Regions:
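Short amphipathic alpha-helical patches
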Residues: 75, 184-188, 206-207, 222-225, ...
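Catalytic core of nucleotide-sugar-dependent glycosyltransferases
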Residues: 196-197, 201-204, 208-234
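Short, charged low-complexity intrinsically disordered segments located at boundaries
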Residues: 52, 209-215, 246-255
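Membrane-proximal basic amphipathic "stem/tether" segments
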Residues: 227-228, 233-281
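Peripheral/terminal regions associated with large enzymatic or DNA-binding modules
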Residues: 97-105, 226-230, 281
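Solvent-exposed, non-transmembrane amphipathic alpha-helical segments
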Residues: 95, 176, 180-181, 214, ...
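Nucleotide-sugar donor-binding/catalytic module of glycosyltransferases
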Residues: 1-211
Length: 281
C-alpha cells in the first residue's frame, strides 16, 4: 500500500505552515506528499521550501490554476500512490500517528476502495465538533441528499478517479460531493469506516456565502442526475426524514412523538368511521 497526500493552497502561508508541520511530524514516513500552490503572492512558496528536507517524497508546484478543483485534479494527476488523501491548506492531521493507524486500518479491513474516519471541526471561538459523517451506516441517496463524506478524512483508491473521472471543475464548492454521488450512489462503491479522528478542519473560512452557493450547486447537480419526479420526492421528504432520524437518537422524545402520532391516527380512524356511518344513513 502506498499513499499520496495532496495539499492545495493559495495565499494562505499561515495555514499552509500548520498543515505542513502536521504532515512532517508523522511517525509513518513512507508516503508521497504533493503540494499544489496557486501562484501565491504571500510567503507560501518560502514556507514550502523551509519544509522540503522534512519529506522523503515531496513534489510541489507554484503556478496559476483555475480554482480549487482544478488544483486538486493537478495533484491527482501527479500522484503515484495507491491511495489518495486530500488535506487542504489550513487543515491538519490530529496526531503524529494518524497515517500509521490509518494504514493499519486499511490492512485490517482488506484494503477497501474508500476508508474514512472522523473530521474534527475547529471553530474560531475555540469550539470543536467531531463529525463522524455516516459513521459506518450504509450511505444512501437520502443521506447524500443532505450530507456528504468528508474528503479530507478519507483514503481513496487512486484507481477510482480513473474509473469515474476527476472532480468537476465547473463547480466551486460541491464537486467532491458530486464525485461521491457518482461513485457511491450510482457506482455502488460502499466505503468502510473507522472510528478514528483523522483531521482538524478549520471552519474559519466557511462563510454563509459558501453555504448558499453550495445549496445552489447541489440543486444544479441533482437536477442533472435525477429524474424530476424523483427529485421532487427528495425535496419534499428529505427534511422530515432528517427530523425523524434526529428523534430516533433521543428515545424519550421519540416515544412522546410516537405516542402523539398514534393518538392522531386513532382519532382520524374514528372520524373516518363516523363519516362512513353518516354516509350510509
Amino acid at each position: 500500500m502506498t499513499l499520496s497526500i495532496i495539499t492545495i493552497n493559495r495565499n494562505n502561508a499561515v495555514g499552509l505552515e500548520k498543515t505542513l508541520a502536521s504532515v512532517a511530524a508523522q511517525t509513518f514516513k513512507e508516503f508521497e506528499y504533493i503540494v499544489i500552490d496557486g501562484a501565491s503572492i504571500d510567503e507560501s512558496a518560502e514556507v514550502i521550501k523551509a519544509h522540503e528536507t522534512e519529506f522523503a517524497h515531496l513534489k510541489w508546484v507554484s503556478e496559476p490554476d483555475m480554482g480549487i478543483y482544478n488544483a486538486m485534479n493537478k495533484g491527482l494527476k501527479m500522484a503515484s500512490g495507491n491511495y489518495i488523501q486530500i488535506l487542504n491548506s489550513g487543515d491538519c492531521l490530529v496526531a503524529d500517528d494518524v497515517i500509521e493507524r490509518m494504514t493499519q486500518a486499511l490492512q485490517e479491513k482488506g484494503y477497501p476502495n474508500i476508508l474514512y474516519g472522523n473530521m474534527v471541526k475547529c471553530f474560531p471561538d475555540g469550539r470543536r465538533l467531531v463529525d463522524k459523517g455516516f459513521a459506518g451506516q450504509e450511505i444512501t441517496m437520502l443521506g447524500m441528499y443532505t450530507g456528504t463524506l468528508n474528503h479530507d478524512s478519507a483514503y481513496i483508491r487512486r484507481d477510482l478517479f480513473k474509473k469515474y473521472g476527476y472532480y468537476d471543475e465547473t463547480l466551486r464548492i460541491v464537486s467532491d460531493w458530486k464525485w461521491y454521488l457518482q461513485v457511491i450512489i450510482f457506482g455502488g462503491e460502499q466505503p468502510q469506516y473507522v472510528d478514528m479522528d483523522v483531521t482538524l478542519f478549520d471552519m474559519e473560512g466557511f462563510s454563509e456565502t459558501n453555504k448558499d452557493l453550495a445549496k445552489v450547486e447541489r440543486k444544479k447537480v441533482l437536477e442533472q442526475m435525477l429524474p424530476s419526479a424523483v427529485l421532487a420526492d427528495y425535496d419534499q421528504f428529505a427534511s422530515p426524514m432528517d427530523q425523524f432520524k434526529r428523534l430516533q437518537r433521543h428515545p424519550l422524545a421519540y416515544r412522546i412523538v410516537w405516542f402523539m402520532e398514534r393518538c392522531l391516527f386513532k382519532m382520524e380512524k374514528a372520524q373516518n368511521k363516523k363519516n362512513k356511518t353518516a354516509q350510509w344513513n
